[in-house]
Amino acid sequence: MANATAARTAAASATADIPILGTSITAYGVALDLDDFDGTVGGNISGTSDLADLSQQADMITEWFPEAKKVALLFCSAEPNSNYQVQEVATCLANKGIETKEFAFTDSNDVASMTQSAADYADVVYLPTDNIAASNTEAIANILVPAGVPAICGEEGICSGCGVATLSISYYDLGVTTGKMAAKILTGEADISTMPIEYTDATPKYNPTICEELGIQPLDGYEAIEG
C-alpha cells in the first residue's frame, strides 16, 4: 500500500509484480502519464483517489457566489495533479460564462506574491488539492481575508486554513476502502489488473470562522468544519 503519489511512484519503481494499492492520490491518469486512462490502471497498480468531483466544485463557486465574474485559479505549477484540477474546473466555469485566470506558484517562496495577484484580479479564488497550498494556508488567508476575496477549495485541510467552502473527503473512509480492496486481492476475489480506481463520497463543508470574517452566510446543506 502506497500513501500519496510519491510513495506510489517509489513502489512502482521497485516492483512490476507485487500488487500496489495507492491511496490519497488525486489523479491516477496524470500521476502515471496515461493518455487513455479510463478508470483502470492495469498491471499491478490500482487504489483509491481523494479527488472530489470537479464539476461539483465548479458548481459550488456559482452557488456560493452567483455574481462572480472572474475566478483566479491558484495552484502550484510543479504539481501535475493540481494543474489537472484547475484545467477541468476552468472548463466547467467557461461553460458557465465565467472568466478564469491561472496564478501559479512554483514553491512556497512565491505563494504570497501569486496570492496577492490573484486577490487583485478575482471575485473568487479556487484552490485545488495541492501540497504547497496546504502548507501555506496561513499565508494565503492573510492576503485573501483582508482583501475580502473568498476561496473555494479542493479539500478540507486547505479550506480549514484559508477557504470558505469545500467538498470534503474522509481520509479514514478512503483508507477503509483501500483496505477492502487489499483484502479482495489477498483472498483471490479480485485481480488488481482489472480493479478500477475507487472513490469515496464527498461531504459539502464550510469554514465558519472565515465565513464570519467575510460576512458570508453559509448555504443550507453544508456542514461546519470543526475547529
Predicted feature locations:
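Pocket-lining segment of extracytoplasmic ligand-binding domains
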Residues: P80-V149, E155
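Periplasmic-binding protein-like
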Residues: V145-A165, T203
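Hinge/cleft segment of the Venus flytrap/periplasmic-binding protein
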Residues: K184-G227
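Hydrophobic alpha-helical segments within soluble ligand-binding/sensing domains
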Residues: Y28-K69, I169-A190
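Hinge/beta->alpha junction and helix N-cap segments in small-molecule ligand-binding domains
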Residues: T48-S55, F75-Q85, E102-V111, N131, ...
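Glycine-rich, charge-decorated loop segments at or immediately adjacent to ligand/cofactor-binding or catalytic sites
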Residues: A31-D38, V111-M114, C159-S168
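Beta-alpha junction/loop-to-helix N-cap segments that form part of ligand/metal-binding clefts
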Residues: M1-D35, D130-G154
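An alpha-beta-alpha
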Residues: S46-A94, T194-C211
